[in-house]
Every structure is written in structure tokens, then in C-alpha cells.
């Protein structure tokens, strides 16, 4: 497959957030499923090509040994998950991975490091990686944990397009998942990113035992940011043996799709990213996510340390749906 890069327009900055009280978001979740999808698809078509998705690739540039105790995370040093801590990946390996992702059709390259917060020398190395990936013509995103004063500006100077820092869940449920980092810590980092002029990538995880009201609370937090994030990844919990959430009750797929739809309705200009958890979804469930307004997928066999549908399976799915990758002239995988 030929995957010559076609530039993608810069994201449209969302306007000042329309206020969505928690009660109004919760009402969306209560709509009949088909009514909710119809409304989400209408909103989606007002702002995007409904048959186009952006392909993103995610690379763990520093795996394991994280001091945080996020109950879902196999990279936490608090849990025995079989994930060993390693050092920061060398620049040449990162560039090689980015080239491979681009050759497979990805236009967006995300780099994640299992840190509580990056040290100055680490940030200098990441800045080099950002520059090298940007030189390939790819959109860049990093997730490095909490940022200290001046670090967001350093990343901006390196050319970073997006910084990912998820809220994970609603404030009311947050304490059941994480104790080593406060909700306000997350909001403070997001504010630094916004003030530095970097696009915000912020979403959450569902299927951690939260209620529907908690899922509404997460979306309400996101949509009422000023402005709401340009990029909203919605993750379905990937249960990893050794983490506290291993063995949690599996979320009804319709609830996950509802979350995608409500995110699309309340954040109409955002890229809503179908993120972790796709490996366990059927093709039909993924198609419903696209119907609900998801317009980006993470592409590649591994997301950080967890599985993801194989590249060829994604190509076949997009072909069957008559969808295409953003910036490419035809459905992914077609000649």
C-alpha cells in the first residue's frame, strides 16, 4: 500500500465551551440507544466527513516502573504484572518506529513515558524525538505525566502538537482508582498545556466499575473545560492480571458506545478517539462507535503494553465499511 503523506489541516480550536450541566449530560446517556446514535451522527456530519478516520500510532518510549498507583495500569511499580521497567528509548529507535507507523498509514505519532513527571534531561531527549518525528511530516503527541513550571513551554518550542493527560474518570469515582495523584494535579497540568499553546488531548477510561452517572461526570468535566479538548480519547478498560482491576465486571458494549456518542454531542469539534480496548470489540461494535462519532483509531499491534487489533484487521474493517484514512485517497489498504 502506498502511504504518501498528505498534510492534514490544523485542528479547529473549539469555541468557549457551551455549558453542559451534569444533569444534561446524564440525560443524554438515558436516551434510547438508537435515538442517541442518530443525534450523535447528525452532530458528527455537521463538522466531519463521517467516512474518514485519522490513524494514530502509540509508542511506549519508557515502559514500567511508574510510581503512581493507578489501579488499571500494568506499568505501575505497585503491582506485579510482568512489565519490567526500562530506560528511555534511544532516538534512532523512536524514529524507526515512527517511519514504520507512517508507512502503514498513520499520520499521528504518540509517545508515552511511564513517569510521574519528566526530569529536565528526560524532557530534552523527548524534545529531540518530537523534532525528529515532526521532520517526517507527522503530527506529534506525548504523554509524560505531570508537568512542572516551564516544561509545557519547552515542549511547545520543540514543536509538539498535542499533550495527552487524561482525567480518567469523574471526580467522585477518582479516589477509588488512584491515590498518588489528585484530580486537581491533572487539571493543573492541563492548564499549563493550554497556556503554552499546545493542543489538549484529554479523555478517560470506562469499564472500571464506575456507574453511568460517573461516565456522565467524566464527559461533563471534559466538555466544560475552557475550551474543551481538541482530542478526546475514550478507552475501554483492558484488564491486566496483577492490577487491582483484573477481574472487574466487563462493561456492556452499548455503554461504551453511549459514552462515545455523548462525547461527540457535547464536544462537536473534537477528535473523538477510539482508543484502548478495541482488541476485544467485534467489528460490529467498532462500526457502531464510528456511527456514534468516533473519528480516530490507534493503529498498530500494541498500545503501550496492551494488545490492539492487527494492522491488517483494521485495514480490512475500514474497507468493509467503505471508510478511508484521513489524508489518503482511498480506504486503508486499497491500491
From Swiss-Prot:
Disulfide bonds: none annotated. GO terms for molecular function: 2 iron, 2 sulfur cluster binding; 4 iron, 4 sulfur cluster binding; biotin synthase activity; iron ion binding. Its cofactor is [4Fe-4S] cluster; [2Fe-2S] cluster. Binds 1 [4Fe-4S] cluster. The cluster is coordinated with 3 cysteines and an exchangeable S-adenosyl-L-methionine. Binds 1 [2Fe-2S] cluster. The cluster is coordinated with 3 cysteines and 1 arginine. InterPro entries: Aldolase_TIM (IPR013785), BATS_dom (IPR010722), Biotin_synth/BioAB (IPR002684), Biotin_synthase (IPR024177), Elp3/MiaA/NifB-like_rSAM (IPR006638), rSAM (IPR007197). GO terms for biological process: biotin biosynthetic process. [4Fe-4S] cluster binds at residues 66, 70, 73. It comes from the Bacteria. Residues 51-278 form the Radical SAM core domain. Keywords: 2Fe-2S, 4Fe-4S, Biotin biosynthesis, Iron, Iron-sulfur, Metal-binding, S-adenosyl-L-methionine, Transferase. Its EC number is 2.8.1.6. Pathway: Cofactor biosynthesis; biotin biosynthesis; biotin from 7,8-diaminononanoate: step 2/2. [2Fe-2S] cluster binds at residues 110, 141, 201, 273. It catalyses: (4R,5S)-dethiobiotin + (sulfur carrier)-SH + 2 reduced [2Fe-2S]-[ferredoxin] + 2 S-adenosyl-L-methionine = (sulfur carrier)-H + biotin + 2 5'-deoxyadenosine + 2 L-methionine + 2 oxidized [2Fe-2S]-[ferredoxin]. CDD domains: Radical_SAM (cd01335). Catalyzes the conversion of dethiobiotin (DTB) to biotin by the insertion of a sulfur atom into dethiobiotin via a radical-based mechanism. PANTHER family: BIOTIN SYNTHASE, BIOTIN SYNTHASE, MITOCHONDRIAL. Homodimer. Belongs to the radical SAM superfamily. Biotin synthase family. This is Biotin synthase. The gene is bioB.
